[in-house]
């Protein structure tokens, strides 16, 4: 059962009730707190586009606590983060794994953060195939192309050589916030909101 808290705000026109995510959106905060699938991606993309249309000069804050998920859904979020004019600050908390860590690293340069006890896990894309041998071969070639593209992006965002990224993502690679900072996945570790930019 997924309960969504409601907050009540006093306005000049009386009380107004919001679900917590709508209230956070007023402060330009987006929460990615689940596995990434098409529905989650569509929601995140819509919020990014809305906030950018509202004010492209103000930063957007994307908080990430996600085990990862669909590559295509995650890439829709990644592309939209780059598409919008507003800088997207990313804040990792809890666990940012797989596509979650990829999106954490995709934040605006100098504006990628993690909370002190966050864990970050990188690895290569996962995929499965069944069917005839030729279909399995096509799927394998496809996942290898995705792996190459994601490793290239990670190398650009972290400053690590491509070969290092390829080696380090060969298996599940868990990092503390400090290790992720040293690696270049994030820019800084913050303990409160005053550590955010802008």
From Swiss-Prot:
Record NCBIfam families: clpP, PRK00277.1, PRK12553.1
Residues forming the catalytic site: 98, 123
Record family assignment: Belongs to the peptidase S14 family.
Its EC number(s): 3.4.21.92
Annotated compartments: Cytoplasm
Catalyzed reactions: Hydrolysis of proteins to small peptides in the presence of ATP and magnesium. alpha-casein is the usual test substrate. In the absence of ATP, only oligopeptides shorter than five residues are hydrolyzed (such as succinyl-Leu-Tyr-|-NHMec, and Leu-Tyr-Leu-|-Tyr-Trp, in which cleavage of the -Tyr-|-Leu- and -Tyr-|-Trp bonds also occurs)
Classification via CDD domains: S14_ClpP_2
Species per Swiss-Prot/TrEMBL record: Listeria innocua serovar 6a (strain ATCC BAA-680 / CLIP 11262)
Top-level taxon: Bacteria
Any one GO molecular-function label of the UniProt entry: serine-type endopeptidase activity
Function as written in the Swiss-Prot or TrEMBL entry: Cleaves peptides in various proteins in a process that requires ATP hydrolysis. Has a chymotrypsin-like activity. Plays a major role in the degradation of misfolded proteins.
Name the UniProt record assigns to this protein: ATP-dependent Clp protease proteolytic subunit
Biological process per Gene Ontology, one example term: protein quality control for misfolded or incompletely synthesized proteins
GO-annotated cellular components: cytoplasm; endopeptidase Clp complex
Taxonomic classification: Bacteria, Bacillati, Bacillota, Bacilli, Bacillales
Enzyme class (EC, first level): hydrolase
Entry annotated with the keyword Protease: yes
SUPFAM superfamilies recorded: ClpP/crotonase (SSF52096)
Principal subcellular localisation of the protein: cytoplasm
Keyword flag Hydrolase: yes
Subunit structure: Fourteen ClpP subunits assemble into 2 heptameric rings which stack back to back to give a disk-like structure with a central cavity, resembling the structure of eukaryotic proteasomes.
Keywords from the named record: Cytoplasm, Hydrolase, Protease, Serine protease
InterPro entries found in the cross-reference section: ClpP, ClpP/crotonase-like_dom_sf, ClpP/TepA, ClpP_His_AS, ClpP_Ser_AS
């Amino acid at each position: 059962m997924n309960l969504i808290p409601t907050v009540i705000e006093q306005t000049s026109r009386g009380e107004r009730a919001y679900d917590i995510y709508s209230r956070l959106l007023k402060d330009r905060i987006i929460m990615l707190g689940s596995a990434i699938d098409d529905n989650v991606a569509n929601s995140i993309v819509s919020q990014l586009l809305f906030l950018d249309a509202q004010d492209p000069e103000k930063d957007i804050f994307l908080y990430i606590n996600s085990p990862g998920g669909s590559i295509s859904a995650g890439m829709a979020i990644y592309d939209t983060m780059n598409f919008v004019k507003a800088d997207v600050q990313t804040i990792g908390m809890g666990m940012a794994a797989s596509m979650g860590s990829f999106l954490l690293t995709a934040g605006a340069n100098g504006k990628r953060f993690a909370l002190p006890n966050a864990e970050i896990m990188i690895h290569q894309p996962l995929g499965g195939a069944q069917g005839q041998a030729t279909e399995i071969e096509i799927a394998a070639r496809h996942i290898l192309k995705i792996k190459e593209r994601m490793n290239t992006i990670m190398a650009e965002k972290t400053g690590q050589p491509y070969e290092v990224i390829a080696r380090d993502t060969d298996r599940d690679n868990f990092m503390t916030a400090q290790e992720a900072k040293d690696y270049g996945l994030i820019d800084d570790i913050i303990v409160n909101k005053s550590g955010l930019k802008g």
